[in-house]
């Protein structure tokens, strides 16, 4: 196990050390995505009809488990330079030409198609609002459907707009744990999980379809020892809210994320096929117990 200090990755709520910048984004804003059904040529995650809308590079939440940092370090470097070599959560670029890109995107081309917003960053980061609303104001009247994936509470600012097009919208949040100390380590700049549950309640009150990705589920560790107890607490809350769909998956190794995580937890984290099967069984049993509709996403080992 590599030994890093917290200062190495600066996973804290202070964003003053983040490298902020701009880049040019190429329209159309909607691009192909593998986060869809296998029948659509995807990886078996039912999050879109094979389309995603991303409009930033980086994410301020700084979750150490995130797979996106590995993508940027491998593929985005040639386009934006050394900034993506900084630790995850310490670089963030937004498009300087976003208004032009919104205007040049032929939204009606995706009429009736489910688009994920967003797959490589949170679309409701403070640095991106009200850009997210500008996009929706153009896309929703054109008939585009959206699965909005967020950890932010800022989405509640747009419930008026989203409820107007409720047949075209699924509002979905990510929750990895309800244990507050553990959440503060693995989701250092995201709003607390209980605040995200409140987002779902407010969305249901205005008639929106809502979902949750319970992920990533970590194996037992010194900070959060009892996985089943944590999962059961989550499922109880989701059943009480009346969540429409629930997906789950365990922690996966991507790029340097395991080194980040182990340095923050100060212990080795073991993940393997046996753990995936054990957690998948536990998750499915809890879905059935609380009469929730959903699915466990198994890793392809």
From Swiss-Prot:
Q: What keywords would UniProt list here?
A: 4Fe-4S, Iron, Iron-sulfur, Metal-binding, S-adenosyl-L-methionine
Kindly provide the name given to this protein in its UniProt entry.
Answer: Uncharacterized protein ORF301
> What PANTHER family has UniProt attached to this entry?
RADICAL SAM CORE DOMAIN-CONTAINING PROTEIN (PTHR43432:SF4), SLR0285 PROTEIN (PTHR43432)
The domain of life is Viruses
Iron-sulfur among keywords: yes
Q: Where is the Radical SAM core domain?
A: 45-286
Q: Does the keyword 4Fe-4S apply?
A: yes
* GO function terms (MF aspect): 4 iron, 4 sulfur cluster binding; catalytic activity; metal ion binding
